[in-house]
Structure formats: structure tokens, C-alpha cells
């Protein structure tokens, strides 16, 4: 009997061990698949464009950029450093893969899968680490109702909200991240000493001061004034996408780039049309915004290094900054196009996607120039339309009224107006008429590049709205038999105009309920979208940049 019990116990232990091994193998396979969604891609830049002093500046800025990585990691989740330390110390192969994906995602939450945890079971707080994890919208709003004098600091882009006893308090970034920002400030001042260009030197010194004062206005103005410079850098807290509770709080990032002078000169013509583009918006004149500055420089650059918010998950193609409406009113905004990132994404992602989702006879219209020009017009379109608005007689900003819906609505608007303005450039004779089909078709292929990022993410959600709206209104057709999609060129412009009007009026009126309804109705994973996305499983979702400077 005793022998039988021993044998049964051993069989039970063996069975449990086998199951555990199978589960572990499945976990390893799953993690490797997640990592393989991002194609490792070397990002090089032309060293010959830099003189010896500029090379020193770039190296210093690279050191400062790495601090932005650490700051953003802290902003994403309160336990990020603890988790990373545990994974770094582990010798378990599963933890090694988990760490690799953690580094891509800047935390244990899968940005491609609605922020579901891939390590541990805790859900990601909507407010990331900008607010107490248990803070609700209701509690935040009630606090402001009872403490109206706190509104400005609590809704500031550059404060974190913390509990102190039974109270809530807004802590400036300069205090909350004092150690890191003091170090970054020092490095920027060191870099400024080697900067030959006076405008770059001025920006670096003012941005260094801003890290300590928490006032970024003067340094944003100085960034807009950069002139005849080779090094194009932006560093600090900018985008609010990570704050899904209110879209109030700015995340730290850095774009370290060098200017491509020949390509930049080619695009100078477009900035002359900004006022005309505003006039051409499909909304009543009373809602058009002619008070923004019109300097609006456009730069084509090679990215040397990206850090923080811009590097988490999906890589940025271009940016349009600053976001401060006061700076935009005075000077406009700067559009910066990352050409080497565009080239990598077109080759590895966009064209292979087009081959799988588009009707074969429309594939001929997918071109790199249409892809690049759409990104340009997308960024220019961020600077168009309502900014400061009046709601119930009170002056406010679109982003404050639309709250957590703002990022998705704004990205959707920029993509819709990106097409609208490319078509306008045909009317103005800047582009030839034969580019029209390229504009429509290349964008449609690009929709499926974006929605793979997850429709809970601002760009993916914005593109889902466009796809479903255009499909439902006859601008796109889905062929069930071939499982492909196509543009109905004769219907597309009218449908585009209607959606542009709806988005712009939501912004002009600060219509929070209208924004929520549009997102609920159209930012959905519709049947045809599911089928088409399923076909793309054999392709990477994005690139995983291996920056030459970081090797």
C-alpha cells in the first residue's frame, strides 16, 4: 500500500511538473511573438553633417535624452522601477523576454492590446502615475468644485496630483522630479557651451532653466526661433496621450535629430498656404482660427535618438510642437518630419500591408511620396482649426473641454484634414492631379498600420473612426470574397468633407458629449476591420529602433 502511495505521489508530481513546463513554454512563445511584432531596425544618421563641436553637443543631448526615458518610465506606472529591478536580477528565460517587452512598452502593460498587463495582474491606472491610482474623475471634479482656486494648478500640464493626508495637492514637475531635472538641466547647459549656433544655444539654456522653474513658455518660444541650425532637438514634457483620465498631464520625451537641408528647402512652399488652408476649412467662418502665428517652419530631419513618450511602443513619424496655445498664437508651430523613420516604416510596414488589404488594381497608387506628404499635412493640420474657444461665455481651450476624448478627436481631425489639405494642394497647382488617387489609397493602407496600434490609442482610435465612417457612407468598399478594401474615388471627397465638419464643430463648440458619441459609434473594431487586421498577423506591427548612437 505504501509503495502504491509513493508511486501515485510521484506520478502526480510528474504530471504537475509537465503541465508547468508546458505552461512555461507557452508563455515563452507568447512573449516572443509579442516582441517579434516590432521589427528591429537600425536607425542611422549622416555624421558628415556635423562638425566636431556639433558632435559633442549631440553626445551631450543623448545623455540628457536618456534621463527623459527614466522620467517617462516613472510617469507611466508607480511600480515600474521595482518591476524592472526584479526582472533585471532574474535568470529565468521568461523574465528575460518579459524585460525585453517591458522595455519596448515602458512598463508591464501592452500598448497594442488596450494596456492589458503582460506581467502581473494589476490593471494600468487611467491616470498613469500622474494622479493617485485610486483617484476617480468624480473625486477630482468635486475637489475643484470645492476648491476653485486649485483649478489652474490641478489642470496644468506640468503638475502631478498627490494625496497629502485627506487632501489633494498639485506638485510641480520641477519638485516631483527634482533630482532628474536638475541633472538634465546641467547637461543642457554643458551642451550649450559647445553650440556654435546662437539660437540653439539660447534654446538649450532656456530649456535648462525651464526644467528648474516649471515654466516652459520662454523656451518654447526660443525653440520656434531656431534658425540656420543643424541640430534640431526638442526635450521636455509635451504630449498628454498617457493621461487617459483627463488628457491634462504632459509626458517627458526627446527627439534628437539633425536637419536635412536639401529636403527641408523642398517643403518651404507649404508654409505659405497655412492661412489659405484655414480659410478652406469646411466650417462657418466664425469658428475659423486666424489668430495663430503663421511662421510655421517645416523641417525634414534624420532622427539620431528618440526618448520617453515618443519611444514607447509605436514610433513617431513626425511631430508638430509646441502645444502651448500662447506660443501658437504668437508664432505658430513647427512641423518636424523624421525622414529616416518614414523610409523604414514604408519599406517594412506600409507597403506590405497595402499588398494584403487593398484591391489589387489600387495597389499601384501606394507611393512613398503620398505617405510622406500625408504625414506633413497631418502635422500642419494640428495647427489648424479651433484652439481657444468660448463655452457659455467663458474663454477656454478645446483640450480642456474635450478632456479624455481630446487626443483621439485631435488625431482624427489631423488625419482627415491631412487628406483635405493634400487635395487642396492639387487645386492650388502644388501637386499634379494624378496624385489624387495616391492620396486616397495610400491613406487607406495607412489606416491599417495605425489601427494595429490598438483603437484605444489616440492614433489608432482616430483612424478607426475614419475607416468606419468612410465605409458606412460609401467612400470605401469591403469585398467579402477577396477580403480586400478599396476607395470609391467618386464618393470619397464628399464623405471626407462631412466628417471634417463634424470633427471641427465638436472642437469649436467644446462638445464633450458629441466627442464621446463619435468615438463610441465609430472607434470600434468593426467586422471588416477585424478580418483585414487578422490578415496582417504575419507582418510586424511597427519597428523597434536600434539607434546607432546608443550602441
Label each PLM-derived region with a short phrase.
Residues 6-8:
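Sec-dependent N-terminal signal peptides
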Residues 12-15:
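C-terminal motif of bacterial Sec signal peptides marking the signal peptidase cleavage site
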Residues 17-19:
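Bacterial signal peptide processing site
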Residues 23-195, 199-203:
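N-terminal helix-rich structural modules
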Residues 31-59, 151-408, 412-415, 420-424, ...:
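Fold-level signature of zinc-dependent metallopeptidase catalytic domains
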Amino acid at each position: 500500500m505504501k509503495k502504491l502511495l509513493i508511486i501515485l505521489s510521484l506520478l502526480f508530481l510528474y504530471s504537475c511538473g509537465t503541465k508547468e513546463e508546458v505552461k512555461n513554454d507557452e508563455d515563452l512563445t507568447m512573449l516572443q511573438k509579442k516582441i517579434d511584432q516590432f521589427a528591429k531596425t537600425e536607425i542611422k544618421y549622416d555624421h558628415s553633417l556635423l562638425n566636431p563641436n556639433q558632435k559633442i553637443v549631440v553626445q551631450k543631448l543623448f545623455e540628457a535624452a536618456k534621463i527623459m526615458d527614466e522620467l517617462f518610465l516613472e510617469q507611466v506606472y508607480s511600480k515600474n522601477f521595482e518591476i524592472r529591478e526584479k526582472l533585471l536580477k532574474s535568470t529565468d528565460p521568461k523574465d528575460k523576454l518579459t524585460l525585453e517587452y517591458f522595455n519596448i512598452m515602458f512598463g508591464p502593460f501592452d500598448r497594442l492590446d488596450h494596456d492589458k498587463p503582460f506581467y502581473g495582474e494589476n490593471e494600468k491606472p487611467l491616470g498613469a502615475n500622474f494622479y493617485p491610482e485610486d483617484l476617480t474623475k468624480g473625486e477630482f471634479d468635486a475637489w475643484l468644485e470645492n476648491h476653485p482656486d486649485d483649478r489652474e494648478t490641478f489642470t496644468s500640464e506640468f503638475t502631478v496630483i498627490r494625496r497629502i493626508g485627506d487632501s489633494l495637492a498639485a506638485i510641480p514637475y520641477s519638485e516631483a522630479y527634482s533630482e532628474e531635472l536638475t541633472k538634465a538641466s546641467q547637461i543642457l547647459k554643458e551642451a550649450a557651451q559647445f553650440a556654435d549656433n546662437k539660437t540653439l544655444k539660447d534654446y538649450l539654456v532656456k530649456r535648462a532653466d525651464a526644467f528648474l522653474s516649471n515654466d516652459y513658455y520662454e523656451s518654447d518660444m526660443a525653440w520656434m526661433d531656431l534658425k540656420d541650425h543643424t541640430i534640431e532637438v526638442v526635450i521636455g514634457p509635451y504630449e498628454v496621450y498617457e493621461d487617459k483620465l483627463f488628457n491634462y498631464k504632459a509626458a517627458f520625451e526627446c527627439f534628437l535629430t539633425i536637419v536635412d537641408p536639401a529636403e527641408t528647402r523642398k517643403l518651404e512652399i507649404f508654409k505659405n498656404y497655412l492661412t489659405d488652408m484655414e480659410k478652406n476649412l469646411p466650417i462657418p467662418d466664425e469658428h475659423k482660427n486666424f489668430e495663430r502665428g503663421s511662421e510655421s517652419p517645416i523641417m525634414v530631419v534624420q532622427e539620431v535618438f528618440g526618448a520617453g513618450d515618443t519611444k514607447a511602443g509605436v514610433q513617431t513619424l513626425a511631430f508638430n510642437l509646441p502645444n502651448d496655445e500662447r506660443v501658437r498664437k504668437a508664432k505658430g508651430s513647427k512641423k518636424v518630419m523624421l525622414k529616416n523613420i518614414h523610409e523604414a516604416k514604408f519599406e517594412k510596414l506600409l507597403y506590405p500591408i497595402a499588398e494584403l488589404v487593398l484591391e489589387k488594381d489600387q495597389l499601384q497608387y501606394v507611393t512613398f511620396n503620398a505617405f510622406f506628404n500625408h504625414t506633413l499635412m497631418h502635422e500642419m493640420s494640428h495647427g489648424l482649426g479651433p484652439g481657444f474657444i468660448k463655452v457659455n461665455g467663458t474663454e477656454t481651450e478645446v483640450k480642456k473641454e474635450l478632456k479624455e476624448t481630446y487626443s483621439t478627436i485631435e488625431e482624427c481631425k489631423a488625419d482627415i484634414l491631412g487628406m483635405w489639405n493634400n487635395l487642396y494642394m492639387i487645386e492650388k497647382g502644388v501637386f499634379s492631379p494624378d496624385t489624387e488617387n495616391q492620396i486616397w489609397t495610400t491613406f487607406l493602407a495607412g489606416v491599417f498600420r495605425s489601427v494595429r496600434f490598438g483603437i484605444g490609442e489616440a492614433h489608432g482610435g482616430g483612424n478607426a473612426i475614419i475607416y468606419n465612417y468612410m465605409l458606412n457612407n460609401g467612400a470605401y468598399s469591403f469585398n467579402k470574397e477577396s477580403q480586400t478594401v478599396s476607395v470609391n474615388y467618386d464618393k470619397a471627397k464628399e464623405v471626407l468633407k462631412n466628417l471634417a465638419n463634424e470633427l471641427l464643430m465638436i472642437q469649436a463648440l467644446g462638445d464633450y458629449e458629441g466627442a464621446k458619441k463619435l468615438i463610441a459609434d465609430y472607434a470600434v473594431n468593426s467586422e471588416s476591420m477585424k478580418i483585414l487586421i487578422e490578415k496582417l498577423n504575419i507582418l510586424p506591427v511597427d519597428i523597434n529602433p536600434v539607434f546607432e548612437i546608443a550602441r
